[in-house]
């Protein structure tokens, strides 16, 4: 893949502006960063991924070379960005962060790559949303550590190779199936992050409570963990909201009743369903008789973007048996009807298997 020399300055400006905006994202992001594990040993859960990744990094250290490129996939909030930061930290390398939507032209990517030093780690979040020209340039950069710079225009144009020091690309995606095969095949290590178990989330909440200096009793952390949808990011967010409730409406100690009252106030029920989840199920059951309904129609009916329903609500609802994906659309399960206090149609049938959540 090639790009024109005159695109470089403009692309450099675009990248710097996007990167600065991402870093200055308010107090919420700063608190989340403070709660992130710093090493693989501090990571709770994801045992298989943690062990495999640790082996890859240790082998690279012993060889004195940059690790293979890494692709991390899975639902939002499970720790893909955290693992990218840990990879850089474990290798003692600088981390450069950007995102797929910010790389709209091949020149954007070339500007980033031209500033890389040997051993640097480049993290591209939402890598499946990169532009096609940038993807094609990335093929050569990942495999041969070079890109072609085009000098001039028309018949007299000349392509000059630009050498790039060996680096490690860490790509993160919630939709691995949208990545072209040639790009996916260039990652030496791929891992899919799974939802966390309640006991793992309990440990995460306990750790975060210590870092935030929140007094939480064991039954309080367990309650927060059980309503966190298997997602550490949500667990930490709920902990902060429960902390606020405890400080304002209680004596500052997060007990089981305090946690329950706080989470009920924020409309997170005992199974972890929030307003969006219940809205999806309610529309599906009441308006469409349980389905099947196409995802786009369902998103319009609940007043959300398709991506929000598909990537935030749907994985949790499918995993917990409230929603089924069929070739004809989404179908509410008997558990969904029961959770809403409704009676399921007597003819309700479900498919034996569903297509993968994140592969198409």
UniProtKB/Swiss-Prot annotation:
Region (Small ATPAse domain (RuvB-S)) location: 197-267
Region listing for Large ATPase domain (RuvB-L), in residue ranges: 4-196
Sites where the protein binds DNA: 306, 325, 330
Disulfide bonds: none
Region (Head domain (RuvB-H)): 270-360
Subcellular location: Cytoplasm
Molecular-function GO term, any one: four-way junction helicase activity
Subunit structure: Homohexamer. Forms an RuvA(8)-RuvB(12)-Holliday junction (HJ) complex. HJ DNA is sandwiched between 2 RuvA tetramers; dsDNA enters through RuvA and exits via RuvB. An RuvB hexamer assembles on each DNA strand where it exits the tetramer. Each RuvB hexamer is contacted by two RuvA subunits (via domain III) on 2 adjacent RuvB subunits; this complex drives branch migration. In the full resolvosome a probable DNA-RuvA(4)-RuvB(12)-RuvC(2) complex forms which resolves the HJ.
Residues annotated as binding Mg(2+): 81
High-level lineage: Bacteria, Bacillati, Actinomycetota, Actinomycetes, Propionibacteriales
Protein EC: 3.6.4.-
Enzymatic reactions: ATP + H2O = ADP + phosphate + H(+)
Protein name: Holliday junction branch migration complex subunit RuvB
Gene from which this protein is expressed: ruvB
Gene3D superfamilies attached to this UniProt entry: 1.10.8.60, P-loop containing nucleotide triphosphate hydrolases, Winged helix-like DNA-binding domain superfamily/Winged helix DNA-binding domain
Comment, domains: Has 3 domains, the large (RuvB-L) and small ATPase (RuvB-S) domains and the C-terminal head (RuvB-H) domain. The head domain binds DNA, while the ATPase domains jointly bind ATP, ADP or are empty depending on the state of the subunit in the translocation cycle. During a single DNA translocation step the structure of each domain remains the same, but their relative positions change.
Role: The RuvA-RuvB-RuvC complex processes Holliday junction (HJ) DNA during genetic recombination and DNA repair, while the RuvA-RuvB complex plays an important role in the rescue of blocked DNA replication forks via replication fork reversal (RFR). RuvA specifically binds to HJ cruciform DNA, conferring on it an open structure. The RuvB hexamer acts as an ATP-dependent pump, pulling dsDNA into and through the RuvAB complex. RuvB forms 2 homohexamers on either side of HJ DNA bound by 1 or 2 RuvA tetramers; 4 subunits per hexamer contact DNA at a time.
InterPro entries for this protein: AAA+_ATPase, AAA_lid_4, DNA_helicase_Holl-junc_RuvB, P-loop_NTPase, RuvB-like_N, RuvB_C, WH-like_DNA-bd_sf, WH_DNA-bd_sf
Main location: cytoplasm
Enzyme class, broadest EC rank: hydrolase
The organism of origin for this protein: Nocardioides sp. (strain ATCC BAA-499 / JS614)
Swiss-Prot/TrEMBL keywords: ATP-binding, Cytoplasm, DNA damage, DNA recombination, DNA repair, DNA-binding, Hydrolase, Nucleotide-binding
Swiss-Prot/TrEMBL GO biological process terms: DNA recombination; DNA repair
